[in-house]
């Protein structure tokens, strides 16, 4: 069970002292230790596990340094590899190992000091790192890093989430029957709800009021990144924030005197991995989220829609909407406790730890209710969904939904396709200053296979920004160059 949760956000200006990454992570760990409300808890932690932190990767053993700074004498120090799903997989493993008796108390921590380091680097200031002795043992590693993209996508440079999620969004727009203008307004309202949640979150990076109109309107300070997304719709990794939770056996918590009203029980979790985008049958939905949702609901003995508190992985609006639709949640309902990865902040792989920390507090204030947290890696490629409550189940249950995911129908990719194809989805990529770079199209061949194309004609790409291009035809060459047929 989870007995404690802590978060820490630091905001510094250029020239001001900033906590380096392990110190920031340790601040969240100390907050979790204090949240347990008992003495002696630091001495009871036998494993400190750090979700892969990009800003802490230069240390010989970052989780060891975090433990030392937090006053924890753990026997094990772990880096958990992976993407945005990693907080979910780390919690599952900790629960399983505690039930098996191999551990009694595990501290999970995630975070990034990306903003302060970027600030210093842009100003040409040296970033001071605490030096660990040369003979410092390396951390144990859990999990693996995987390639999230198909080779054909990689060959065209379509590898970044900001290129991928807009394609899902345009496909969703078609299913919803929105014109581009209507959908832009819809996205503004959707993101405004996240902004409102962030305003009540003391740890959120951006607690300013952002209206639907402001969010939806492209402007110099809110330029398009990949249509239809403006900057105020997408994850902000330029943050300094960390979160931590402590997972513990009932026996250890009882012995330490941690009050039962602090306890939150993970009831069940399920996970899976999707096919690459090239092979997914449709782009507006997710077999992965659907089957993972079915699995976790069956294990928990209640529907996902029964969760009173929800925090979905929130890197882009399409990620949240697709998850909500597949899990049976209201896409227009409250889907984030924190404010999501744009307004609360998107510390790379670690965001879902903030979701778990916020969920602990939400469930404590609403005893007996159920919460749901999702953790997503890649382009809705790896997903973990966890249901939690202050009311315990007999034991924690976990299942992989992979067999059902693998058995689902999929689409064939037309590698090296040459000829006319019909646009299935698209996005126009923008860079600094609002400059158009190109347009990415996903198309269907006459035999209903999928093909990728990149339109480098800037006039053609500009024409696609405000117009509905789904169903229009393009000509694709074998190297992936696409040209308009309109």
Go through the PLM ranges and name each one.
Residues 381:
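Gly/Pro-rich active-site capping loops and adjacent beta-alpha segments
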Residues 78-86:
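General structural concept
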Residues 344-352, 363, 368:
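A conserved active-site cap/scaffold subdomain adjacent to cofactor or substrate pockets
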């Amino acid at each position: 069970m989870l007995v404690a949760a802590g978060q820490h956000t630091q905001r510094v200006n250029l020239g001001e002292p900033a906590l380096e990454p392990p110190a920031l992570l340790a601040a969240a760990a100390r907050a979790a230790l204090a949240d347990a409300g008992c003495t002696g808890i630091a001495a009871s932690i036998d494993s400190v596990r750090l979700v892969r932190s990009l800003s802490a990767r230069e240390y010989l053993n970052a989780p060891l340094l975090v433990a030392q700074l937090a006053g924890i004498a753990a026997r094990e120090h772990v880096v958990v590899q992976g993407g945005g799903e990693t907080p979910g997989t780390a919690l599952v493993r900790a629960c399983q190992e505690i039930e098996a008796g191999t551990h009694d108390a595990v501290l999970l921590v995630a975070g990034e000091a990306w903003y302060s380091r970027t600030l210093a680097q842009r100003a040409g200031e040296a970033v001071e790192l605490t030096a660990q002795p040369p003979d410092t043992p390396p951390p144990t590693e859990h999990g693996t890093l995987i390639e999230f993209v198909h080779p054909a996508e990689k060959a065209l440079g379509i590898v970044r989430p900001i290129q991928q999620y807009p394609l899902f969004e345009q496909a969703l727009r078609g299913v919803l029957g929105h014109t581009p203008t209507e959908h832009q307004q819809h996205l503004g309202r959707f993101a405004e709800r996240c902004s409102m949640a962030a305003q009540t979150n003391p740890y959120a990076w951006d607690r300013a009021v952002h209206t639907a109109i402001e969010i939806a309107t492209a402007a110099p300070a809110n330029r398009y990144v990949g249509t239809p997304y403006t900057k105020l719709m997408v994850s902000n990794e330029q943050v300094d924030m960390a979160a931590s939770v402590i997972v513990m056996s009932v026996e250890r918590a009882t012995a330490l005197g941690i009050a039962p009203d602090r306890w939150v029980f993970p009831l069940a979790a399920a996970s899976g991995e999707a096919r690459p985008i090239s092979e997914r049958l449709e782009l507006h939905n997710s077999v992965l989220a659907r089957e993972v949702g079915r699995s976790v609901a069956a294990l928990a003995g209640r529907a996902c829609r029964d969760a009173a508190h929800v925090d979905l992985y929130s890197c882009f609006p399409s990620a949240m909407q697709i998850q909500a639709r597949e899990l049976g949640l209201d896409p227009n309902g409250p889907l984030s406790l924190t404010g999501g990865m744009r307004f609360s902040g998107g510390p790379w792989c670690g965001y879902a730890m903030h979701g778990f920390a916020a969920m602990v507090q939400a469930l404590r204030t609403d005893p007996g209710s159920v919460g749901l947290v999702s953790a997503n890696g890649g382009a809705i490629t790896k997903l973990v969904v966890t249901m939690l409550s202050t009311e315990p189940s007999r034991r924690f249950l976990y299942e992989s939904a992979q067999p059902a995911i693998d058995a689902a129908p999929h689409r064939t990719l037309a590698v090296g396709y040459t000829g006319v194809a019909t646009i299935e989805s698209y996005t126009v990529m923008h860079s600094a200053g609002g400059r158009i770079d190109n347009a990415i199209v996903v198309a269907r061949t006459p035999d209903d296979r999928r093909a990728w194309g990149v339109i480098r004609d800037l006039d053609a790409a500009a024409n696609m920004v405000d117009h509905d291009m789904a169903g229009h035809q393009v000509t694709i060459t074998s190297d992936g160059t696409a040209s308009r047929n309109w």
